[in-house]
Amino acid sequence: MERKYAWHNYDDATMEKVYALSDTYRQFLDNGKTERECVVQAVEFAEAKGYVNLKDIIKSNTPIKAGDKIYYTHMDKSIALFNIGTDDIELGMNILGAHIDSPRIDVKQNPQYEDSNLLFWDTHYYGGIKKYHWVAMPLAIHGVVVKTDGTRININIGDNENDPVFCITDLLPHLGQEQMQKNAAKVIEGEALDLLIGSRPVKDEEKEGVTKFINNLLEKEYGFVERDLLSAELEIVPAGKARDMGFDRSMVMAYGQDDRVCAYTSLVAMLEVDNVKRTTCCLLVDKEEIGSVGATGMQSRFFENAVAEVLTLMGKPNSVSVRRTLENSRMLSSDVSAGYDPLYTSAFEKKNASYLGMGVVFNKFTGSRGKSGSNDANAEYMGFIRRVMESNNVTYQTAELGKVDLGGGGTIAYIMALYGMNVIDCGVAVLSMHAPWEVTSKADIYEAKQCYVAFLNAADESI
């Protein structure tokens, strides 16, 4: 089946828009290396477009009506935005849903130890990483430290050009013969992913002198002591900015593009769509990389609760209205797909793979080995999606996640489908997914945004 190359469709004016969107996208990535940082930006962007905090509306008991724009944050790690349409909300919403957590390495609660005059922080990796990717490269520390009096200290060390960086060391090849005999899953063990944070001792201190020096420095410069790490969330991420990639600058290379490339384009699309007939919604959520668990993951009830609050203030304070609204909704689960890599052909079935530069990707299903754990979108919904995309000149492709018995993956799609709504995965093809630095095509980023705008505006279309 013939595929369209998105780049061929652009005139000079559109090409400028393609590159301009990626410029602002790179800024979003640089300022959002954690889920908390992404939520801060989302709130800033939303308020600039006239969105109001739902919590303030609840306090004032102000009725919600068509034309109102609302956002709701949950524990500073997830956010939902609503643009209330003129149609009865019980007829359903058009929902975009992406995740803003990414694979990384987290600092343990009791992490600090000194060995051979070197001070380390012990860690526990988060999400599906290849552990050997993370050694011998500059790393930054982002997150929060919360003291017993409730004071929250925001931490961002390693991404300013004047900041120090950190690293996880590796064994030199001259002594690495035994290490090199291990398989890739074992060549770097999880317990060996310890972050080197200092080596200078306090003068005239022979025992744990480095520990004392660093502890003094942390208290003086950052305002917390070692014991405060018990109530900290510190994330170790690659140090450095998102960059244009290729002689033609046609790609973006950056950390966290799974799934912030879809989060950003979903957010931009949501804020671009103004007066709507059918209520629109954008969800940016946490914890997808570890199964969407916990209070800030999609398996929690925070989104359902937010919808219930909105409906109550619209004069529909009953569970039936909530159920009707959710069941009648349509969703694009905005998540990335595995881009075909000609260096690793054995992992893909070429007819059903996604390709860089060929537009936004629809995954009718994900899951693994027999579609296990999958949301399998209905053919009727896929037909509706095709109609919306083609009537809006969006370049799109369809794909599966690799060969049938090789592996697979999942998204938040199956969770939202529990409400009975139509859901399909839709996002951007990525090379080197889950590596510290991932690669996307600027054409695909642009087509994703165009796709999301078209979907949000699809009010009169029936399935």
Predicted regions and their residues:
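N-terminal hydrophobic/helix-forming segments and targeting peptides
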Residues: 1-463
